[in-house]
């Protein structure tokens, strides 16, 4: 959930968590309780390229705050995590391509009528889907096409499974992984029209989506851009069903703010 505070996020989570018998993706396992002090791992080798210096400085301040709160801050090696963006932008568009195939104006979406059924589909999809949606459908269709499935989609899933095992092994020695939320602060609406640069802004957050691990982004510091003060965030990632650990650490930043 998107909320104004970590406390509000926890309240919403407590409402939506748990098993729903009508939802096959839900789980009855209860979240792990808080433990107070945590061992927090920082994959520093992942923070070398593409991160604005003041964003990195802000991240170091956040680490110092957590250290002062009694948490143990250690370096952790996650060599495969650098591939998360590439893997994500193969798997995710493939899923978009598959899911959006139902958007035909008959079963889903508003119909724009043409001369025949094929034109119904092309007009509806061409007129109702945005540029980014179309781009992701095309990327996904390409990755799933004959001759490229094994080269792209299948390999992406293999790397994803390797990343999952790597992170699970890391969590045997640490409790939480800490990263900046984004390598840069927010840019102006319409300022960044390059899709690749837009995708690169997700570099630190896509791994949680790929692996299904709980994560939280907390606005903690501020940086200056063109005489404007912009927030930057701290991202915390926990093992499966350890959401309470994220809220425990995050709520202390709420108090500081």
Regions found by a protein language model. Name each.
Residues 24, 37-39, 43-45, 76-89, ...:
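Flexible, acidic loop-helix segments that line cofactor/substrate-binding pockets
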Residues 9, 40, 66, 100, ...:
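Residue-level signal for inorganic ion chemistry
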Residues 52-54, 85-89, 189-190, 230-233:
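Short acidic, glycine/serine/threonine-rich loops at helix termini
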Residues 16, 44-48, 78-82, 93, ...:
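Glycine-rich beta-alpha junction loops
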Residues 16, 73, 102, 111-257:
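Glycine-rich, small-residue loops and helix-cap segments
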Residues 21-27, 70-79, 168:
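Flexible, glycine/charged-enriched surface loops at secondary-structure junctions
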Residues 86-99:
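Charged, often glycine-rich, active-site loop that binds/positions anionic groups
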Residues 1-58, 62, 117-123, 257:
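A short helix-breaking turn/cap at a secondary-structure junction
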């Amino acid at each position: 959930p998107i909320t104004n505070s970590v406390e509000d996020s926890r309240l919403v989570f407590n409402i939506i968590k748990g098993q729903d018998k009508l939802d096959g993706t839900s789980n009855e396992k209860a979240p792990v309780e808080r433990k107070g002090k945590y061992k927090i791992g920082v994959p520093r080798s992942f923070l070398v390229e593409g991160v604005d210096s003041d964003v990195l400085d802000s991240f170091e301040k956040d680490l110092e705050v957590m250290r002062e709160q009694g948490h143990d801050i250690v370096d952790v090696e996650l060599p495969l995590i650098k591939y998360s963006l590439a893997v994500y932008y193969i798997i995710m568009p493939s899923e978009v391509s598959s899911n959006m195939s139902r958007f035909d104006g008959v079963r889903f979406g508003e119909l724009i009528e043409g001369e025949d059924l094929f034109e119904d589909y092309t007009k509806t999809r061409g007129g109702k889907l945005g540029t980014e949606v179309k781009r992701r459908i095309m990327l996904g269709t390409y990755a799933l096409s004959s001759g490229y499935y094994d080269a792209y989609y299948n390999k992406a899933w293999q790397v994803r499974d390797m990343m999952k095992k790597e992170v699970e092994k890391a969590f045997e020695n640490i409790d939480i992984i800490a990263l900046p939320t984004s390598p840069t602060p927010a840019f102006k609406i319409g300022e960044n029209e390059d899709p690749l640069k837009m995708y690169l802004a997700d570099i630190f957050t896509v791994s949680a989506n790929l692996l299904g691990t709980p994560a939280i982004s907390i606005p903690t510091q501020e940086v200056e851009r063109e005489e404007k003060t912009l927030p930057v965030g701290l991202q915390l990632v926990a093992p499966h069903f350890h959401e309470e650990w994220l809220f425990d650490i995050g709520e202390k930043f709420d108090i500081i703010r």
